[in-house]
């Protein structure tokens, strides 16, 4: 069964546009150094979908990516404790959804994005996924 996630990146480090340029091969999502986020990465399966969130600058959901390779050891982690996944670009939102708008939308204000602001990889329930897709003016993927 497909699962839904949100992953964060600082756009000056890795943006949705850079993700798009990575093409069908996608890009490795690495560098995550939080144990709860790591645990979420290990639960990701091929075909799962993730909202792509620009953190720090913008603070908004800007698109959707798909997991194309499930968790493997993160080569940037010298200790071997953390994992990475590989994701490919699916769609960029015409209307990015700001954190402020998410906080003000009662139906999705419960999300970890609001409650655990430092968490960089988090699950998204299907009902919230549908609402956010509608808000971003994309068809439900």
Q: Which residues fall in each region the model found?
A:
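Loop/turn positions that initiate beta-strands
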Residues: 47-48
């Amino acid at each position: 069964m497909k699962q839904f996630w949100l992953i964060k990146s600082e756009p000056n480090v890795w943006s949705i546009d850079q993700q798009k340029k990575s093409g069908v091969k996608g890009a490795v999502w690495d560098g995550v150094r939080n144990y709860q986020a790591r645990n979420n990465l290990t639960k990701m399966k091929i075909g799962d979908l993730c909202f792509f969130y620009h953190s720090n600058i913008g603070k908004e959901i800007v698109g959707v990516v798909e997991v194309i390779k499930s968790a493997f050891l993160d080569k940037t982690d010298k200790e071997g404790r953390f994992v990475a996944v590989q994701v490919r670009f699916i769609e960029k939102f015409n209307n990015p959804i700001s954190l402020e708008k998410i906080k003000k939308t009662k139906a999705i204000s419960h999300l970890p994005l609001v409650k655990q602001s430092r968490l960089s990889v988090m699950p998204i329930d299907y009902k919230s996924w549908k609402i956010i897709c509608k808000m971003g003016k994309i068809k439900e993927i």
